[in-house]
Amino acid sequence: MSLSSLSRALARSARSSRQRQGSLLGGHGGLRASSPPLPCGELGFLRSYVTSVIGNRAAVASGAGKGGDWRFLLASRQFRRLFSDKSKKNHGKHSEEENKGKGDESDKSDSKKQSSSGDQWNFEESIKQFKDMIAPLFLFGLLLLSASASSSEQEISFQEFKNKLLEPGLVDHIVVSNKSIAKVYVRSSPSIDRIQDSDIHITTSHLPGIESPSSYKYYFNIGSVDSFEEKLQEAQKALEIDPHYYVPITYTTEAKWFEEVMKYVPTVLIIGLIYLLGKRIQNGFTVGGGPGKGGRSIFSIGKVQVTKLDKNSKNKVFFKDVAGCDEAKQEIMEFVHFLKNPKKYEELGAKIPKGALLVGPPGTGKTLLAKATAGESGVPFLSISGSDFMEMFVGVGPSRVRNLFQEARQCSPSIVFIDEIDAIGRARGRGGFSGGHDERESTLNQLLVEMDGFGTTSGVVVLAGTNRPDILDKALLRPGRFDRQISIDKPDIKGRDQIFRIYLKKLKLDKEPSFYSQRLAALTPGFAGADIANVCNEAALIAARSEGTLITMQHFESAIDRVIGGLEKKNKVISKLERRTVAYHESGHAVAGWFLEHAEPLLKVTIVPRGTAALGFAQYVPNDNLLMTKEQLFDMTCMTLGGRAAEEVLIGKISTGAQNDLEKVTKMTYAQVAVYGFSEKVGLLSFPQREDGFEMSKPYSSQTASIIDTEVREWVAKAYEKTVELIKQHKDQVAQIAELLLEKEVLHQDDLVQVLGERPFKTLEPTNYDRFKQGFQDEDSNRNAELSNADGASSLGEAVAS
C-alpha cells in the first residue's frame, strides 16, 4: 500500500466522519443528517476503522477516565486486523468472495495450511515483522492525529467573542492555556433566541456520556495576558455587567503530547540519519578496494582484504593446467612438496626457502602458476596485489602488511602471493627523485621486516610476481627473503604446443586437437600463454559469427591476423591510386624476402586494411632463433626496405606508407652498430639503451655518436641499393603479384610459388613454415630415422674401409 493511497483514504474517512458526526448531533445548525455509505474496496477496513475512531472522538474524550470506553476500539475487527499477520489473508478472502466457485475450495485449503503453519511461532521472523511495522505505524499515527486534530472547536476573533458570546451571556468561563490561547466554555443551556448570528452554532442536546455544565467550543489567541485581561474587563464594563458576574478566568499550562512529540521529531530524524549513515559506512560506504573485492570500510581502512583459498575451495587450478614452463613449475612444486611432507626435508637438515620471485614478461603465466600452487599445496593460500597496500591515508600500507602476515601466521603453514610486487618494492631513493620518506618506502620497510627480521616465524612462504625485476630494491632480493628468482620466459614451439592442447580441449574442432596444436604452435612464434588463450577465444568467436558448427584452420588463421594486425576493415574508403600503391608496396616485400637467403619465409600477403594505420601487411613465419648473424640482420633490413624500393622502381613515386618500415630499419641498424658490435669503426663496444628511455647523459662522447650516426646511414644506404637492384631484376614478377593482390586481396605462399617458383634456397633444418604445413612431431621422427640411417651407413663404411 502506497503512502499516497493511504493519505487519500484517510482524507476521505475524515470527511465522512464529519458527516457522520453531524448526523449524530441531530441536525443542528444546518448540518446534514445523513452521510453516504463508505466505499468498499482495498482500504475498506482501514477507512471504516479511522472513521469509527474520528466519529466517536467526542465520546472517547469525555470518557477518557473510564477504561471501558476504549473497549469498542479493541473489540473492533478492523483494529485487530491491523496488528494481525492474518490481515492479508482475510483481506484476500474478502476480495475473492466476488469470484465464487473453484476459488472456495482453494481458499479453504490455503486457510488450513496457513493455520497449521501459523502455529509454529518464529521469534526472529516476528522481530523482523515488528521492525518492518514501526515506520508504517508511526506514519499512520501521525496521519491519524492530523485527521483527528480537525475537531469541532472553532477559532474566532476577540470581536466575535465579545459580540456573539459575551454580550448574550453565553460564556461560562475562560481557560487561558499556556498564556497564549483563550478557550471559551459555553454554557450548557443557553438561550438560543439571544444568538444574533447563525454562523455560530450552539447545540443544546448532549451526547451520551457528557455531563459537564459547559463545553469547550471556541478559542482565540490573546497575544499577552495583560492586554487580554484589560480588553475583557473593558468589554464587560461596556456591557454593564455586574463585577460579581464577571467571566471567571483560569490559567493552565497544558502539554499537548502531539505537539511535544513533534518537537522531538527533528532530533529523532537526525539521530536516525546518523544511525543509517553509520550502518552504511560499516556495510557499503567504502574507500578504495580492488576490482571484484568491493571497498573497505573507513573504520577498517588499515586492514587488508586478502583473497584466501583453502583446500575446500572450488574452481581450483592444478599444475596439469599449466604448460609451457616446465622448469619453473618444477621449482615451484618443491615448495608444495615441502609443505606437504616437511619431515622428508627436515631429516636431511634442509630448510624451505622463505620466498620465491616469479620473473617474466607479461602473459607468461606467473599468476596462473601461483593459482596452481594454491590448488596443489593443500594449505591456506593468501593472495593480494601490490597496489592493495597503497592508500590515500598515511600509515595504511605498513598496517596492511602487518595484518597480512599476522593472518598468514595464524593459519601457518601457509603461502602468501603478492602479485605485481614492483608497486611497493621499487628501489628506495633511486636517482634522487623519490623523496626522503614516503608511503611506499614505509610499506617496503615493513615488508622487509616481516619477511626476515626480529620476531619472524617459520611456516609462511612468500611468492611474488613481477615483470620488472630490475627496479626492485636489492634488500628485497637478497637470500633470506626471496631466496629464488624463477624466470618464466615466453614458451618455445613445444611449450606453445602444450598450451594449445590445454585450450583446444575446450573447443569444438573439426579435427583432433593435436593436429591444430602443432601447426598453430609453428604459426605463433613469440606468443605468450595469454596470447594463445586470446587466439583460441577469437577463433571460437569468429566461427560463431560465421554461423559455423565447428572451428576450422581458417578460423584460427583469421584469429591470428586479428591478434597481430588488428580488426579487419574491408569497408575503409581507399582510392584506386592508394590501393595500387599499397599492392606494389606489399609485393615488393614479398619478392625481396623470396629471393634473399636469410629472410624469413613468407606465409601470406594482403592489402586488406587492419588496425588503425596498416593498409596492408606481409606475414612471415620466423624461426625461434636464439642467435642472429650479421648476414641475417642485413637480409632482414633489405626485406623491410623492399616496399619503398618497389614504389620507387615501379611507380616512380614514394609515399608515407614506408614510415613503419623505416622505423624498424633504423632501430635494427642502430642495434647492430652500437649494441652488437658489428661495426669495425665503432669497435667492440656496446651501448644498450634503457627501456624507459630516460637518460640524462650518453655513455659515449659526441665524436662516437657522430661515428655511430655515419655508420647507420651507410649501412642503410647499402641495404637499400641492394634491394633496388633486386626489385629491378624481378620487376615483372613484382607487377604480377601486385595485380594478383588487386584481384584477390590475399595471397598465400602457394600463390607466390605459381608466380615466382620455388625458393632458390634450401635449409638443412625444417623451418616453422614446414612445421606449420606438416606438423613437427612427424618431422622429428623422420629426422631421428635419418640420423640413425646415417649412423648405420657411416659405421658400415668404416667396417668396409677396415
UniProtKB/Swiss-Prot annotation:
Binding residues annotated for ATP, in chain numbering: 360-367
Free-text remark on how the cofactor is bound: Binds 1 zinc ion per subunit.
Chain residue ranges for the region called Disordered: 1-33, 85-120, 773-802
Subcellular localization, as worded in the UniProt entry: Mitochondrion inner membrane
Pfam family for this entry, one: Peptidase_M41
EC assignment: 3.4.24.-
GO cellular component assignments: m-AAA complex
PROSITE patterns (UniProt xref): AAA
CDD domains given in the database record: RecA-like_FtsH
Topology class, membrane: Single-pass membrane protein
Primary localization class, coarse: mitochondrion
Keyword line: ATP-binding, Hydrolase, Membrane, Metal-binding, Metalloprotease, Mitochondrion, Mitochondrion inner membrane, Nucleotide-binding, Protease, Transit peptide, Transmembrane, Transmembrane helix, Zinc
GO biological process: mitochondrial protein processing
PANTHER family: ATP-DEPENDENT PROTEASE, ATP-DEPENDENT ZINC METALLOPROTEASE FTSH 3, MITOCHONDRIAL
UniProt similarity note: In the N-terminal section; belongs to the AAA ATPase family. In the C-terminal section; belongs to the peptidase M41 family.
Protein's UniProt name: ATP-dependent zinc metalloprotease FTSH 3, mitochondrial
Originating organism: Oryza sativa subsp. japonica
